[in-house]
């Protein structure tokens, strides 16, 4: 979340909504939001059941209001004396909604099929990743998500893609297979211990995690304080 916070600042995003699924890890996500002090415009919890999810996304994005705005505008122009009303109506009929959204970016704290369901619902409610930032957590192991053309660009600020691709190539050369999520965590853990040891002249490891430190690994940034 600290990396996402930095990304939001660097890109000049002003209004961010945060979508959290009602899952076992919901509390951890909210705890992370609070500790990172990331600037959030509004927080929403959602039910991952498909039918309920779509209804909730419709409400969050004011979809029905924006859809009604479009229908009302078409009716208004039809009944007007505008000499160019046929062309205007034709252009309006190519749209799905009319009216702005009250956010610049959406952070989706979800994974796998559930994440895809959320992005699909956003597209259905006429929220495009080409106009609003779609941001999510570490998803580099889900190649199928990267292949979803309709939801691009989607941002994963926690990992540098170029570094990750280089790591995969090196791992493949050494072990003749692609790395798993666990192997990547192990890779970062070794780097983390080495980094902290080098800062302490390799004298002791007993107090390495008691001092506040920050380490940028392949999986993202690790913030350590009081053995946590």
Where do the protein language model's features map onto the residues?
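Beta-alpha junction/loop-to-helix N-cap segments that form part of ligand/metal-binding clefts
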Residues: 1-2, 114
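An alpha-beta-alpha
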Residues: 2-48
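Structural motif
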Residues: 19, 107-109, 135
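Short acidic, S/G/P-rich loop/turn micro-motifs used as interaction or catalytic elements
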Residues: 23-26, 112-116
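Extracytoplasmic ligand-binding site segments that recognize negatively charged/polar headgroups
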Residues: 25-29, 52, 186-190
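Extracellular/periplasmic periplasmic-binding protein-like sensory domains
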Residues: 34-46, 53-86, 101-105, 117-187
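Extracytoplasmic/secretory-pathway proteins
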Residues: 89-100, 104-112
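Segments of small-molecule ligand-sensing domains
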Residues: 176-190, 194-228
């Amino acid at each position: 979340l600290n990396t996402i916070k930095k990304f939001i600042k660097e890109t000049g995003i002003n209004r961010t909504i945060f979508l959290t699924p009602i899952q076992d890890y919901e509390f951890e996500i909210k705890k992370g939001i609070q500790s990172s002090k990331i600037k959030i415009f509004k927080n929403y919890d959602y039910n991952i059941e498909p039918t309920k999810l779509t209804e909730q996304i419709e409400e969050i994005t004011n979809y029905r209001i924006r859809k009604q705005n479009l229908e009302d505008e078409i009716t208004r122009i039809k009944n007007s004396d505008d000499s160019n009303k046929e062309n205007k109506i034709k252009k309006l009929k190519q749209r799905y909604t009319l009216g702005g959204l009250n956010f610049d970016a959406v952070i989706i704290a979800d994974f796998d099929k559930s994440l895809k369901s959320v992005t699909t619902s956003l597209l259905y409610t006429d929220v495009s990743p080409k106009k609003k930032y779609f941001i999510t957590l570490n998803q580099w192991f889900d190649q199928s998500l990267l292949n979803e053309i309709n939801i691009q660009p989607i941002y994963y600020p926690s990992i540098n893609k170029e570094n990750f691709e280089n790591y995969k190539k090196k791992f493949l050369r050494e072990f003749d297979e692609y790395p798993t999520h666990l192997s990547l965590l192990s890779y970062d853990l070794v780097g983390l211990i080495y980094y902290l040891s080098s800062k302490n002249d390799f004298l002791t490891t007993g107090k390495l995690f008691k001092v506040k430190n920050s380490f940028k690994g392949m999986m993202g940034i690790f913030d350590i304080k009081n053995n946590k």
